[in-house]
Amino acid sequence: MISVFDIFKIGIGPSSSHTVGPMKAGKQFTDDLIARGILHDITRVVVDVYGSLSLTGKGHHTDIAIIMGLAGNLPDTVDIDSIPGFIQDVNTHGRLLLANGEHEVEFPVDHCMNFHADNLSLHENGMRITALVGDKAVYSQTYYSIGGGFIVDEDHFGQTNGSAVEVPYPYKNAADLQRHCQETGLSLSGLMMKNELALHSKEELEQHFANVWEVMRSGIERGITTEGVLPGKLRVPRRAAALRRMLVSTDKTTTDPMAVVDWINMFALVLNEENAAGGRVVTAPTNGACGIVPAVLAYYDKFIREVNANSLARYMLVASAIGSLYKMNASISGAEVGCQGEVGVACSMAAAGLAELLGASPAQVCIAAEIGMEHNLGLTCDPVGGQVQVPCIERNAIASVKAVNAARMALRRTSEPRVCLDKVIETMYETGKDMNAKYRETSRGGLAMKIVTCD
């Protein structure tokens, strides 16, 4: 089963597939060198990056992420403030300390970090890392970053994801989940909690939920006090801090009901600005869509009822259940299915989680998730300049409001829906596979070709 620990992972920006995954791959490679007993023999490491991972790699800091992974770092624990200085050192000296300083190798970046526009055979996000002794390659591994920070090596590509431990209520689709709920009388969150307890202790789960929510809230608090311009050639100004000041100073929520929308926008904008700046965020289910699930929960916390341990667990469990359906039966990779697999999935997850907190039945929860995705079908991934900024940041805000609307529509529906969640997931995947590669995180089409970056 794909666990809540798999869907919600603490990491760094700006991208789960292009930053978090590559860093994990770099770390895995040096772990393999240690396990094989050859780390201290290596004189040079060469990295080759392919497809979408290459085409938008510079804007997503893929090269930096791989280097930091080779150096022994992981996304959830890396010291973000130390990264610029470390990379400057590597660029200056052409040397790289592997595995937390265990061994130093040659690494002239211009020759050891190579970008290739063509795809490897199995996925759009491919990378190959090779260790050499002199001019002889002694170990090489190919990795694919398949979305949401998940990586898989070539030998294990296509194998079942998630834990092999038997859970009380196994499922492959939304129909299975609804059937289990109907037979047991459990809510969807209650059902998922029983599955999670087969994998983790109650204390572990509660701690994970608390850690995830703390990172989300810390991102909001950090972002609303930070202004200036985001990194990169686009020179995109941060907007969330100014928007919050405006909201706090006017406090029109009592006279203008639509002011709630402004708050939801602010919550989403601030987290995606933090992500774009390379800050600490939570994959939900990806970094490119990291603002939606927390923005909707922050809306609930501020305007409906203060979030407590119980409501936090219910929201996270349901959102991760929906995310797992897309992970199992479609994709959460923008390079594979476009932005519908990132922002669309996050919208679906958040809509379902909110519906659960608002008292929805399992069937209504799935309707909310279906609405959230149905109206993101065909959404392209065309980041300007290869950066997770335009249109990504605003898109998270729009999708957050859409998720709230989807949950409310599901709760107030009196007729049977014509489209079920499983069919919309199937449609999303087919649509993504039919989508021209220009619109799947390559920055070769759409807005990416219409907006001129600043020098």
Predicted feature locations:
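An N-terminal structural lobe/cap that precedes and organizes the functional/catalytic core
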Residues: M1-G13, R36
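Short alpha-helical scaffolding segments that buttress acidic/His motifs in well-ordered protein cores
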Residues: I7, G11, I264-N272, Y315-G323, ...
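Conserved phosphate/anionic-ligand binding catalytic regions in large, soluble enzymes, centered on
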Residues: F8-G26, A277-V296, V337-C347
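Alpha-helical support elements that line or immediately flank enzyme active sites
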Residues: S17-I34, P294-E306, A351-G359
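C-terminal regulatory domains involved in ligand/effector binding and gene-expression control
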Residues: P75-T253
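Accessory "access/gating" subregions that flank catalytic or transport cores
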Residues: H200-G338, G446-D455
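Hydrophobic alpha-helical bundle architecture
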Residues: V307, V318, S324-A397, M409-R418
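Extended hydrophobic packing segments that form well-structured cores
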Residues: R418-D455
